[in-house]
Each structure stands twice: as C-alpha cells, then as structure tokens.
C-alpha cells in the first residue's frame, strides 16, 4: 500500500468510528497477529500509527485545546 492509501484508511476509520478508531485498528492488528498474517499486521500497524498521529476527533462546533 502507498503512504497515501494508508492515510486514507486511517481517515476512513476515524470517520466511521470516531475516537474508537484506535481500538478498532488495534483489534484488527491483533487479529492479523493471531492469523500469522505478517503483511496484514504491517498494514494495520501503519494505519494505527497514522490514526494516533491524527489525534482525537473534535465534534463540530467545539474547539480543540
């Protein structure tokens, strides 16, 4: 996957799951580990890292401090 695709996946997970996106990605990461899917594990590790870099979802009409 390209860097752009990884960022797109991270953004999509945040849109779908809000502040639970990190937890969702972590569960998928664990599933890849249990399945011994090294490529899938790497992808989800990259997505998880990008979600954490994006920070928390701030509801519309509020400001982040």
Please give the residue ranges for each predicted region.
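Short, charged, intrinsically disordered terminal tails
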Residues: 53-65
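Amphipathic, hydrophobic secondary-structure cores in small proteins
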Residues: 11-56
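Generic signature of intrinsically disordered, low-complexity, basic-rich segments
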Residues: 4-6, 31, 60
């Amino acid at each position: 996957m390209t860097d752009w695709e990884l960022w797109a996946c991270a953004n999509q997970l945040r849109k779908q799951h809000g502040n639970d996106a990190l937890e969702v990605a972590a569960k998928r990461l664990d599933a890849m580990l249990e399945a011994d899917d090294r490529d899938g594990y790497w992808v989800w590790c990259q997505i998880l890292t990008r979600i954490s870099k994006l920070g928390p979802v701030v509801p519309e009409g509020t400001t982040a401090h």
